[in-house]
Structure formats: C-alpha cells, structure tokens
UniProtKB/Swiss-Prot annotation:
It catalyses: (6S)-NADHX + ADP = AMP + phosphate + NADH + H(+); (6S)-NADPHX + ADP = AMP + phosphate + NADPH + H(+); (6R)-NADHX = (6S)-NADHX; (6R)-NADPHX = (6S)-NADPHX. Its EC number is 4.2.1.136, 5.1.99.6. The gene is nnr. This is Bifunctional NAD(P)H-hydrate repair enzyme Nnr. In the N-terminal section; belongs to the NnrE/AIBP family. In the C-terminal section; belongs to the NnrD/CARKD family. InterPro entries: CARKD, Nnr, Ribokinase-like, YjeF_N_dom, YjeF_N_dom_sf. Residues 9-201 form the YjeF N-terminal domain. It comes from the Archaea. Keywords: ATP-binding, Isomerase, Lyase, Metal-binding, Multifunctional enzyme, NAD, NADP, Nucleotide-binding, Potassium. (6S)-NADPHX 2 binds at G305, D404. It comes from Archaeoglobus fulgidus (strain ATCC 49558 / DSM 4304 / JCM 9628 / NBRC 100126 / VC-16). Binds 1 potassium ion per subunit. Residues 55-59, 118-124 are annotated as: NADPHX 1. K(+) binds at N56, D114, T150.
Length: 464
C-alpha cells in the first residue's frame, strides 16, 4: 500500500486545481467512491451520514446522491463552510434528501457514514463531534469513515477518541496513520479519484501556500531571521538574495559582505541591514565573527557573488558545524553537510558537475545529506528519496541574478519549514514571479524586477 501525508495530499489537491483538475471533480469522484464501497457490501438499507463543515462533509453529500436504492439521511454537525461543501449540500436539498441540523436522538441506521472531520483533525475533539463519535461507536450500524476516521491523526495514527470504523474509504493513496491505527480503521479501501500520477511530482501553488507562513499573533522575527553571507567580486548577488528573502516573508535579513563592498551593497535598498566582515574577501580569520552572527539567525544563505575566493568553501564548511539550517549557492556549495544542519543546495548544471561530477542527482543528495534543487529549464528537487519537478518560469530567467533570488526565497521558507518542502515552494514561486514579469515586460526583465514580483506571485498561489 502506498502512502501520502495529509500535508502532501492537501498540496496535491491545490496543485490539481492549478493544473486544471478541479476540486469539484475530485470531490465528485471521492463521494462516488464511498458509495461504491458501500454498495459492494450492501444492496439496500438505511444510511445516516454525519457531516462536518469542511470538504469531508462535502464528500459525504456526494456519496448520498450515489447511494441509489438506499434510504439516506444527512445530519449536519456544523454548517458547511467551504464552497464545495455548500454547493453539494444544496444539490442534496434540491434532490429531496432529508437534511437535519445537529445529532439524532439515536442512531437507527444499518450504515453510518462518518464524514465529519477527515484529515483536518488534530488534538482533542470538541463538541458536538466528541458526542457524535461516542454515539457512532455505541451503535450496531456498519461504520464507514470517509478518508480517515474522525478523531484519528492522519499522519501519526494517534487519537484520544475516534470513530471505530468497519471500513475506511480513503482517496488517491492511504494516509500513514491508517497503517498505525488499524484497530479504528477496519478494512481500508483506497479509491482512485482521477489524479494523474505525474501531478504528485510537480511543484505548484500548493507548495507555496503551505510553506509561506504568516501568524496573526506574531512579533518581529517570528517569520524568520536570515543571514546572507557572500559577495566579493560581485555586489549585486548578496543584495538580491537578501531582498528576495524579505519579499518572500522573512522578518529580518542581515547581509554579511566584505568591508570593501559594504557601502555599495547597502546602497541597493534602505531595507538592507549590511554588516562588513573582513576586508576584500571573507576568509577563515573572519570565522569567529560570522559564527556569532549565525547564532542570531534561523537560516544562513551562503555563496552568492563570492567569485574567486579559495578560502570561502572552508569558511562554509566550518559555519555548517554550528548552523541549524542553510541554503548554499554558487561558491558555497559543498559535497557533504553535517547532520546537525538541514540544508538546501541550489546548483545549476555546471556547479553540480563541479561538486558532484557525473553522479546522478538523487544519489548526490543522499551523499551530501541535503536537499538538492538542481536549476534548469525544469528544476529538479530531491532529498534522495522524494523527487519533484518544477516547470514554472520562462526564458527571460536566463538573465543574471535569478539564482540569487531563488536562494533568498528558499531561505525565507526554510525559516519555518523543512528543506524539501521549502525547496519545492521556492522553485515554483521563483518561476512564477518570472512569469509575472513576462506578462508585464516580455522576456526583457531583470532580477530586480523578479524580486519585486514575489508578493504578487505569492498572492496568486494563495488564491487557489
């Protein structure tokens, strides 16, 4: 049995909408799948559907329509809140299905369908769901859970109280928690709802929507503190990476560059906090100063704009020993990352060959103990086991500096997310920002234009 985490399933659901496979169609296929599994086991009978406020309830409403020959009742534990659930409930009402608000006095059905919370549940159940779970478990009805039993954590398999299903009908792939809590899942049926296998391996707006985090009760620094270490022969690269991190959501970005170019880098924007480290180049003698800066930041981005500096790689290798998270680009890319550091490497083909030779990219990621985001017309992202491909972007992005922007975006996401998901989200967002630029300027835009397009690209991702 193949598995997919609840997060990756939600990402895939959003990406399907972007690729033209609507959530409405997926819900239709899911609800029909539930009905099919019921009708494999029963020819007739009374069915009571317990529906929550989200799309799990929507799946239940669709199932009601497909249960031909059954006496179906729908109980709303909460009013539907999603557009799809509202629409499918309205169809049920128009079709004449009895719809009642709240819990029944008793369960007198042959079959109960749990379409209450699905994969959205975490922690202790609130009312009326807690009472509903008790009622369902105490009944003699055949119990069918939609996607996962209500109360069960879909990933960890943990629960305090959960529907003890005789049958769980899940979609696309099983959720990991189903294998860890067989005592409440019963038989597990995995239904194909029409998602092409290739979609699971493509980056899209769903990746961005889940990696970009904004907390209503946050204070400065909560959304991430990034340290950019680079510069030397080039001044624009560290500035672009720093600005990209800010535009992608990081609260604080410090740019550490050689003293010789500090004023030039600072002149790019009043939003930059620029620290001079070393004189003409960043060298091993500056390590202690850099290590103090590392302690005050969540993520280190290193390598852009360094140019010819034989000591820089050694500086990076030492910094990684005290660093929890890092994004390494250009001259900062190393072939092995210590276990204490969660790391994204962002080479283009030439840089990849320089560091890893002709090693296949998945094997290189395993060897490096890092996520590799291999830049190209189609970006490849892998941690050695998982692989995703990004197809956003256009030929205008061959202009210099777009890779620096990508590194900054990846760092912003990595502040509050894991390396693989951050890299996937960064690759798509960077390309989408390029597509936003193309709509405005054609192919003739710069990396500065790309940075300024990041907020609009984020809004587009969140609209799906």
């Amino acid at each position: 049995m193949e598995f997919i985490s609840s997060r990756d399933m939600q990402i895939l659901d959003t990406n399907c909408e972007y690729f033209g496979l609507s959530r409405m169609l997926l819900m239709e296929n899911a609800g029909k799948g539930v009905a099919e599994e019921v009708m494999k086991r029963f020819y007739e009978g009374k069915v009571q559907i317990f529906a929550g406020s989200g799309n799990n309830g929507g799946d239940g409403f669709v199932a009601a329509r497909h249960l031909k020959g059954f006496d179906v009742e729908i109980f709303l534990l909460s009013k539907p809140k999603t557009e799809l659930a509202i629409k499918n409930l309205e169809i049920c009402r128009k079709a004449g299905f009895p719809v009642k608000e709240g819990l029944p006095e008793e369960i007198d059905a042959d079959i109960v369908i749990d379409a209450m919370l699905g994969t959205g549940v975490r922690g202790r159940l609130r009312e009326p769901y807690s009472t509903a779970v008790k009622m369902i478990n105490e009944s003699d009805a055949f119990k069918v859970a939609v996607d996962v039993p209500t109360g069960l954590d879909p990933d960890s398999g943990s629960y305090e109280e959960a529907v003890k299903a005789d049958l769980t009908v899940t979609f696309h792939k099983a959720k990991p928690g189903l294998a860890k809590a067989r005592e409440v899942c019963g038989e597990v049926a995995v239904k194909d709802i029409g998602i092409p296998e290739s979609f699971e391996n493509l980056c899209g707006p769903g990746d961005v929507a889940f990696s970009y985090k904004r907390y209503e009760d946050a204070h400065k620094g909560v959304h991430g503190k990034v340290l950019v270490v680079g510069g030397g022969d080039y001044t624009g690269a560290p500035a672009l990476a720093s600005l990209a991190a800010l535009y992608a959501g990081a609260d604080i970005v410090t740019t550490a560059v050689p003293m010789a170019i500090r004023k030039v880098v600072a002149s790019f924007s009043p939003n930059l906090i620029v620290r001079g480290v070393g004189e003409e180049r960043i060298e091993m003698k500056n390590l202690e100063e850099l290590e103090e800066l590392v302690k005050r930041h969540d993520v280190v981005v290193a390598g852009m704009g360094v140019g010819e500096n034989p000591e820089f790689k050694e500086v990076v290798e030492e910094l990684l020993k005290s660093c929890k998270k890092a994004v390494l680009d250009a001259q900062g890319i190393v072939d092995s990352v210590p276990e204490n550091c969660e790391c994204i490497l962002t080479p283009h083909r030439g840089e990849f060959g320089r560091v890893f030779g002709d090693t296949e990219v998945q094997k290189a990621a395993l060897k490096a103990k890092a996520v590799i985001l291999l830049k190209g017309r189609e970006d490849v992202i892998t941690d050695g086991s998982r692989v995703k491909v990004n197809r956003s972007g256009n030929a205008g992005m061959t202009v210099g500096g777009t890779g620096d922007v990508l590194a900054g975006i990846a760092a912003a996401f990595l502040c509050n997310d894991d390396a693989f998901h951050s890299a996937c989200a960064a690759a798509f967002l960077n390309g989408l920002a390029g597509d936003v630029c193309f709509e405005k300027f054609g192919y003739n835009y710069t990396a500065t234009d790309l940075v300024k397009a990041i907020p609009e690209a984020i809004l587009r991702c969140k609209s799906f």
